[in-house]
From Swiss-Prot:
Superkingdom: Bacteria
Family: Belongs to the TrhO family.
Source taxonomy: Bacteria, Bacillati, Bacillota, Bacilli, Bacillales
PANTHER family noted in UniProt: RHODANESE-LIKE DOMAIN-CONTAINING PROTEIN 7-RELATED, THIOSULFATE SULFURTRANSFERASE/RHODANESE-LIKE DOMAIN-CONTAINING PROTEIN 2
Gene from which the chain derives: trhO
Residues annotated as the enzyme's active site: 177 (cysteine persulfide intermediate)
Functional summary from the UniProt entry: Catalyzes oxygen-dependent 5-hydroxyuridine (ho5U) modification at position 34 in tRNAs.
Protein name stated in the entry: tRNA uridine(34) hydroxylase
Length: 318
C-alpha cells in the first residue's frame, strides 16, 4: 500500500482561521492531498489522504511549525485516496458541541488513560463507559459493555447526558471516541457539570487499535470512519460482527446512504438487499422520483415498480 490516511487534531490558538485555511488549502493542493480540515480560533481538526511521500511531507511541514511541533498523527495505510476532494474550512469550533458556555480542553478535560489503562477500565464493573460518538457509529462497532447514547449529532450529547444522569451519578465515568477530539471537550463539559471522576481514552479508538499490548481487545465490530473507507478493523485478538442488516437483521458491516437524496439516512445493508429494496431505507424513499440507485443502475419503470413490491413482503413478515 503506497497511500496513507492521517487523522489528527490539536487544541491551540489560531489567530486568523480564515487566512490560515486559505494558505493551508493551497499547501495541501500543491502536495496533491485530499481530505477535510477544520480550523478555528481553538485549533485544528483534520483527516486527509495522500501517497506516503506526500503525507510524510505534510507531517514534516506541520511539525516544523512551532504551533504544531508536538501534534500527534494517527496513520493508516491505504490502497488509494480516502477522499475525493480537499477542503480546509474555518469554523466556530473544530468539533461542534454548541455549548452556551464553551469548554477549553487545554484547561478543563478528563484524565487521560493509556490503552492499557483503558482496558483495565473496561474490565472494571464499577466503571461506566460512555461512547461519545453517534448512534450509527456505535451500531457498526463499539467497546464491549459501553453505553450507547441515542444521538445522531455530537451536539446532542449533553442533553442526552442530562436526561440520563441517574445512570452515571456518583460513578467513575470513562468516555471514548474515534480519535480523541470529541472526548477532550465532552469530558471537560462533564467536569463542569459536577461529575467528579471523569477519564477519557487518550488518542481514541484509533490509538487503542494500534497499541501493541491491547491489540484492540474488547472491541466488537468495526470502527466507523468519516471517509470513503467507511470502516476499519480494530480488534486483532478476535473478530466479531455486531452490525445488523436494516431489512433482515442478519450480520452486516456494509453502510450505504439511502438512495433518496432528501433522506440520505445511513443504513447497514447487504448488496443483495440494496438491490432488492432499490438502495432505500423505506418504501417512501424507494419510490422517490430522484432515487439515486434507480438512476445509477438505469432501472426501467417496470422493474422499479416490480422491486417496490418487495416492501409488501417485508411488511407481511414484520
Amino acid at each position: 500500500m503506497n497511500y496513507q490516511v492521517l487523522l489528527y487534531y490539536k487544541y491551540m490558538t489560531i489567530d486568523d482561521p480564515e487566512q490560515f485555511a486559505q494558505d493551508h488549502l493551497a499547501f495541501c493542493k500543491a502536495h496533491h492531498l485530499k481530505g477535510r480540515i477544520l480550523v478555528s480560533t481553538e485549533g485544528i481538526n483534520g483527516t486527509l489522504s495522500g501517497t506516503k511521500e506526500e503525507t510524510e511531507q505534510y507531517m514534516a511541514h506541520m511539525h516544523a511549525d512551532e504551533r504544531f511541533k508536538d501534534m500527534v498523527f494517527k496513520i493508516d495505510e491505504a490502497e488509494g485516496h480516502a477522499f475525493k476532494k480537499m477542503h480546509v474550512r474555518p469554523r466556530k469550533e473544530i468539533v461542534a458541541l454548541d455549548l452556551e458556555e464553551d469548554v477549553d480542553p487545554r484547561h478543563t478535560t478528563g484524565q487521560y488513560l493509556s490503552p492499557v489503562e483503558f482496558r483495565k477500565a473496561l474490565e472494571d464493573d464499577d466503571t461506566v463507559i460512555i461512547d461519545a460518538r453517534n448512534d450509527y457509529e456505535f451500531d457498526l462497532g463499539h467497546f464491549r459493555g459501553a453505553i450507547r447514547p441515542n444521538i445522531t449529532r455530537f451536539r446532542d450529547l449533553p442533553d442526552w447526558i442530562k436526561e440520563n444522569k441517574a445512570l452515571f451519578a456518583d460513578k467513575k465515568v470513562v468516555t471514548y471516541c474515534t480519535g480523541g477530539i470529541r472526548c477532550e471537550k465532552f469530558s471537560g463539559w462533564l467536569l463542569k457539570e459536577g461529575f467528579e471522576d471523569i477519564a477519557q481514552l487518550h488518542g481514541g479508538i484509533a490509538t487503542y487499535g494500534k497499541d501493541p499490548e491491547t491489540k484492540g481487545q474488547y472491541w466488537d465490530g468495526k470502527m466507523y470512519v468519516f471517509d470513503d473507507r467507511i470502516s476499519v478493523d480494530i480488534n486483532e485478538v478476535e473478530k466479531t460482527i455486531i452490525g445488523k442488516d436494516w431489512f433482515d437483521g442478519k450480520p452486516c458491516e456494509r453502510y450505504i446512504n439511502c438512495a433518496n437524496p432528501e433522506c440520505n439516512k445511513q443504513i447497514l445493508v447487504s448488496e443483495e438487499n440494496e438491490a432488492k429494496y432499490l438502495g432505500a431505507c423505506s418504501y417512501e424513499c424507494a419510490k422517490h422520483e430522484r432515487n439515486r440507485y434507480v438512476q445509477a443502475n438505469n432501472i426501467s419503470d417496470n422493474e422499479w415498480q416490480h422491486r417496490l413490491t418487495n416492501f409488501d413482503d417485508l411488511h407481511q413478515h414484520a
